[in-house]
């Protein structure tokens, strides 16, 4: 299990696309630049959607664990 410090945690277990990414976007908006959000998810679509969100919105995907459920993603707010 990866150990990355996070400032906020977002549990999206049980939610299906597009809800997890919508919640990630809302959570990131409320955070300060440089803070890290840990996202916990079980929707297989997040393995594509979270990295895509980071690339499109220009936030840093610091780390991810997608080998087993629940998936975990660490996203650093860049701007």
Swiss-Prot record:
This entry's Gene Ontology molecular function terms read: sulfur carrier activity
Please give the superkingdom of this protein's source: Bacteria
Among the record's GO biological process terms, what is one?
tRNA wobble position uridine thiolation
- Keyword Cytoplasm listed? The answer is yes
Q: Which residues form the active site?
A: 17 (cysteine persulfide intermediate)
> Where found in the cell?
Cytoplasm
Keywords (alphabetical) are: Cytoplasm
Which InterPro entries does this entry report, sorted A to Z?
A: Sulphur_carrier_TusA, TusA-like, TusA-like_sf
Keyword Cytoplasm assigned: yes
Q: Name one GO cellular component term.
A: cytoplasm
Query: What PROSITE patterns does the entry give?
Result: UPF0033
Q: Which family, according to UniProt? A: Belongs to the sulfur carrier protein TusA family.
| Function description | Sulfur carrier protein which probably makes part of a sulfur-relay system.
Q: What is this protein called?
A: Sulfur carrier protein TusA
Q: Which organism is it from?
A: Idiomarina loihiensis (strain ATCC BAA-735 / DSM 15497 / L2-TR)
Gene this chain is encoded by = tusA
């Amino acid at each position: 299990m990866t150990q990355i410090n996070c400032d906020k945690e977002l549990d999206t277990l049980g939610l299906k696309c597009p809800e997890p990414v919508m919640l990630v976007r809302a959570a990131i908006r409320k955070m300060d630049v440089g803070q890290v959000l840990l996202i916990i998810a079980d929707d297989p679509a997040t393995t594509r959607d979270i990295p895509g969100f980071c690339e499109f919105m220009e936030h840093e995907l610091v780390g991810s664990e997608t080998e087993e459920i629940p998936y975990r993603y660490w996203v650093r707010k860049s701007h």
